[in-house]
Amino acid sequence: MQDFWQAAAAQLERELTPQQFKTWIKPLAPVAFDEEAHALRIAAPNRFKLDWVKSQFSGRITALACEYWETQVSVHFVLDPAASGRAAAYTQQAMQQGQDAPAAMGTAMGAGHAPYPGMAGMAGGQSYGPAGAQVPGAHPNQMAGYPDYPSQSNGAPAGYGGAAGGQTPYSQSQQSAQGRGAAPTGHPLQGNSAAHLPDMGEIDVAQMDPAEASARSYRVPSPQPAAPAGAQQQSDTVHERSRLNPILTFDNFVTGKANQLARAAAIQVANNPGKSYNPLYLYGGVGLGKTHLIHAIGNFMLMENPRARIRYIHAEQYVSDVVKAYQRKAFDEFKRYYHSLDLLLIDDIQFFSGKNRTQEEFFYAFEALIANRAQVIITSDTYPKEITGIDDRLISRFDSGLTVAIEPPELEMRVAILMKKAAAENVSVPEEVAFFVAKHLRSNVRELEGALRKILAFSNFHGKDITIDVTREALKDLLTVQNRQISVENIQKTCADFYNIKVADMYSKKRPANIARPRQIAMYLAKELTQKSLPEIGELFGGRDHTTVLHAVRKIAEERSKDAQLNHELHVLEQTLKG
């Protein structure tokens, strides 16, 4: 049983993102295997992990168990607070095996076992079902890392289905041994820093899907030792001149599926300023990490070359600088400064809307910087062509580089953010509390930070330990607002209006593409933006089965990561619903 779990953990580590594996699989521990009943019991340390693993990972774990014992196996999950301690030993051994997943499974079986036939010959991105039955390759970052097609029969024995009873094929990760452990070869920039970003010269981020972006392991700058007093004073002066926040670095940027492509693009630009993706245009809602990323790029360039001419500026401040330059008759000096920069970071460019003179000056500055091979990085709350009141010449320049969206963080990422923020405050927050907050607050990082501050203040004021009950009491007003803010009915109406269909079509059995597609999108948004369960959502969509809803959610989630137009439509719908 222990050999099975070590091999299974090694396989799952290859299939899932590091954050997913650490959050959900690593804390699990095998309890017992009943050879007569072919039943495996696996323990989870708390109720949150137990429920999530049962709903998202049971099918895959069952499939691995069936492979190992070469028979149908039922997997049962039980609650055991001591599970994490036992799990650490199992997963640590699995991580040290250093074998490919099929080989690891074969080794764990020992002399009395042979690898399951379906495991033979598995390669990089190919997926196989039992007995070599080939199925479509799995996208490693959907929902909990599993495919999103409906139930299908290809000779698989019972017990291979996921939570929805669908086929669970065997997904092979794109992640290499380098991506799992060894640090990649660095690509030094000009400068003498010992910490380097990876060489991404041959990686086309624009052609990467988020799964590939996350499968690559990047070595980013580590926290630097304290500098001598004189050097520290010089560093402070440099940051004051550039207006960069030295705290915002790649090292403390929490990465997840929602922002991994943006982070990969930022690393590419930091490695090759003025060469790759110029301009880089990042867009997304409030509090999703756009400002953090562009500060991280600037801070890395400053670390590599303290003499680099870098300027971070908010669009409103740029407008103010233009006005002051006119008032003081210092426009030549203004132009000379901005046209000579090595890196210009301009935040919230939508504030240029309607400011024609500012737009004209920025256009000339933009042209000069690009001609000089200086890097320009822009953030906004929306897609370039959706900004109103901006000159078409500027819009076309924004579109000439790389445009990347940053989405609201997914559950695991929200939990990681909360735990990291709590650690920064030297406060211990129970994991189940972090999960509770993350499940109820979904919109952005600032909202999570605000919720954490309220919890800490409430706990200190009342002299109570931080528990779920205390958290619920501290956030009762916020949770009430969240619960009444977005309803499934509102989502249905908004999607119907957006795609020009009738609201009644959301409940109907009609299946033309122009109706089925908006209905699937509405189901996806209902799952993402409300607390409704899959059966509840299905009932509100004309009494549909929960498996239909699950298929729609996974289908749209996968397509969103690959289809820029769909991603943009979903972004508009989400912003509309959130007001």
Curated annotation (Swiss-Prot):
UniProt-listed PROSITE patterns: DNAA
Assigned keywords, A-Z: ATP-binding, Cytoplasm, DNA replication, DNA-binding, Lipid-binding, Nucleotide-binding
GO biological process terms on file: DNA replication initiation; regulation of DNA replication
Chain sites annotated for binding ATP: G287, G289, K290, T291
SUPFAM superfamilies: P-loop containing nucleoside triphosphate hydrolases, TrpR-like
Subunit structure: Oligomerizes as a right-handed, spiral filament on DNA at oriC.
Region annotation (Domain IV, binds dsDNA) ranges: 460-579
Domain remark text: Domain I is involved in oligomerization and binding regulators, domain II is flexibile and of varying length in different bacteria, domain III forms the AAA+ region, while domain IV binds dsDNA.
Composition-biased stretches (Low complexity): 171-183
Region (Domain III, AAA+ region): 243-459
Assigned GO CC terms: cytoplasm; plasma membrane
Pfam family, one: Bac_DnaA
Function text: Plays an essential role in the initiation and regulation of chromosomal replication. ATP-DnaA binds to the origin of replication (oriC) to initiate formation of the DNA replication initiation complex once per cell cycle. Binds the DnaA box (a 9 base pair repeat at the origin) and separates the double-stranded (ds)DNA. Forms a right-handed helical filament on oriC DNA; dsDNA binds to the exterior of the filament while single-stranded (ss)DNA is stabiized in the filament's interior.
Native species: Cupriavidus metallidurans (strain ATCC 43123 / DSM 2839 / NBRC 102507 / CH34) (Ralstonia metallidurans)
Name assigned to this protein: Chromosomal replication initiator protein DnaA
GO molecular function, one term: DNA replication origin binding
Domain II: annotated segments: 71-242
Region feature Domain I, interacts with DnaA modulators, mapped onto this chain: 1-71
Gene name in the database record: dnaA
Locations listed in the record: Cytoplasm
InterPro entries referenced in this protein's UniProt entry, alphabetically: AAA+_ATPase (IPR003593), Chromosome_initiator_DnaA (IPR001957), Chromosome_initiator_DnaA-like (IPR020591), Chromosome_initiator_DnaA_CS (IPR018312), DnaA_C (IPR013159), DnaA_dom (IPR013317), DnaA_N_dom (IPR024633), DnaA_N_sf (IPR038454)
Region ranges (Disordered): 131-196, 212-240
Family designation: Belongs to the DnaA family.
